[in-house]
Amino acid sequence: MDKNALRKQILQKRMALSTIEKSHLDQKINQKLVAFLTPKPCIKTIALYEPIKNEVTFVDFFFEFLKINQIRAVYPKVISDTEIIFIDQETNTFEPNQIDCFLIPLVGFNKDNYRLGFGKGYYDRYLMQLTRQQPKIGIAYSFQKGDFLADPWDVQLDLIINDE
């Protein structure tokens, strides 16, 4: 399917989620995130995101898990039409080499774990520059899986965590 058509279809479905249904799915996904992160004490800094357009939301017990395990969260900040950086919102500092794991929002994903974003390429450009092999985890609802071909500039994610 054409990426733009798929993007539109998935976004419509995501925006149609009821508050109760979204909350239930978010809880399931956050439980799976905690299960994924629990056996990994080497993760001390994690890249998160502020959800937009009904993306998966991180819930209180996930943030409590981060606090208990002393995992620092950093968030993306758009600094130009083509570039993002990740900053610690508490200290307003930018330390790209200290990110141990990326939790990445997406519009859609395919069977090979390629991410369909909003089409601006921010994450693809950023992730291509990494010098370490940090885990790149897509966060999505299961209905966001679609059939599309990756472009040469698309970055393959290591794993997609969803509600299934």
UniProtKB/Swiss-Prot annotation:
- Positions annotated to bind substrate: E50, E55
The cofactor note from the UniProt entry for this protein is: Magnesium. It can also use divalent cations such as manganese, calcium, zinc, iron, cobalt and copper.
The EC code for this enzyme is 6.3.3.2
Q: Which GO terms describe its molecular function?
A: 5-formyltetrahydrofolate cyclo-ligase activity; ATP binding; metal ion binding
Q: What are the BP-aspect GO terms?
A: folic acid-containing compound biosynthetic process; tetrahydrofolate interconversion
- The residues the entry assigns to the signal sequence are none
Which coenzyme or cofactor does it need? Mg(2+); Mn(2+); Ca(2+); Zn(2+)
What Pfam families does this protein map onto? Answer: 5-FTHF_cyc-lig (PF01812)
Identify the main location.
cytoplasm
Q: Which UniProt keywords apply?
A: ATP-binding, Cytoplasm, Ligase, Magnesium, Metal-binding, Nucleotide-binding
SUPFAM superfamilies membership: NagB/RpiA/CoA transferase-like
Covalent S-S links between cysteines = none
Listed binding positions for ATP are 3-7, 115-123, 125, 153
Q: Which GO terms describe its cellular component?
A: cytoplasm
Q: Which reaction does it catalyse?
A: (6S)-5-formyl-5,6,7,8-tetrahydrofolate + ATP = (6R)-5,10-methenyltetrahydrofolate + ADP + phosphate
Cell compartments where the protein resides: Cytoplasm
Segments spanning the bilayer are: none
- What's this protein's function? Involved in folate metabolism. Catalyzes the irreversible conversion of 5-formyltetrahydrofolate (5-FTHF) to yield 5,10-methenyltetrahydrofolate.
Q: Which family does it belong to?
A: Belongs to the 5-formyltetrahydrofolate cyclo-ligase family.
| NCBIfam families named in the record | MTHFS_bact (TIGR02727)
Spell out the subunit comment.
Monomer or homodimer.
Q: What is this protein called?
A: 5-formyltetrahydrofolate cyclo-ligase
Q: Which organism does this sequence originate in?
A: Mycoplasma pneumoniae (strain ATCC 29342 / M129 / Subtype 1) (Mycoplasmoides pneumoniae)
